[in-house]
Amino acid sequence: TSSLVGSEMCIRDRIYGAMLAGGSGTRVKSSKIPKQFIEIGGKPIIIYTLENMLKVKRFDYIYIAVHKDYENYMNEQVKKNIPESEKVRIILGGKERMDTINNVTTAITNDNGIHDDDVIVIHDAVRPFVTEKILNDSIDCAAEYGACVCGLPCADTILHSKGGEYVEDIPVRSELYSGQAPDSFRLAHFIQMQDNLTEEQKKVITGTSQICTMNNQPIHLIEGDAINFKITTDSDLLIVRTLLGGK
């Protein structure tokens, strides 16, 4: 947001949400469409996620990257369900996760430029119950430390097995956390780390915070929430339907 003061333009740093929604979601066997677009109670899951993100009024814009086959559908759903649709930008995702992330950061900088302390909060479309606390903590943490991920201490013992037949190792559980989303960053810092990646590194990234570890950059950890789970399987989908009142 900018305002004219005297003859100078005063521009504050901005906070962007980003939602990655270009995946195919093959582990939900009961649906032929990507899980983020499965409708519950007349709305796709991604809209529930967006509604929770928009509860945080600090976001200037939220960018949603979707597959081209769902671009028109997503635009229609936003217009139908989101009163603050002027805050939402629908863009096309890429072939791989890193391509999609690059499309998001490129769209943001093309639309708005880039300022020193802009923050980007990158969330999964299939974590519809993200809380305001997680989002606000993520913004604050990224602004202070540059990079932030939320996670929970592992409740189960983790078994390391290369082939799924024998246990190779049992890591110390007290040192293990289950990573969630969002992953949040100072935008300029994040873009610089993106640019530093090799093509080989880009192909193996499964989580956004890996961009930091591949750049040997520290990531601050904040506490997640069990309700902020990712919809991965049919069992998860059943839980979501129950939490949304059996819709």
Tell what function each PLM region has.
Residues 228-247:
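Hydrophobic helical membrane-anchoring modules
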Residues 14-72:
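N-terminal glycine-rich phosphate-binding loop and ensuing alpha1 helix
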Residues 19, 46, 104, 123-124, ...:
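Residue-level signal for inorganic ion chemistry
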Residues 1-11:
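Single conserved hydrophobic/aromatic residue that forms the stacking wall/gate
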Residues 129-222:
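Conserved core of the sugar-phosphate nucleotidyltransferase
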Residues 120:
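Short aromatic/hydrophobic "clamp" motif used to bind/position activated sugar donors
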Residues 4, 39, 129, 184, ...:
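Short aromatic/basic micro-patch
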Residues 47-117, 197-200:
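Conserved N-terminal catalytic core of the sugar/cofactor nucleotidyltransferase
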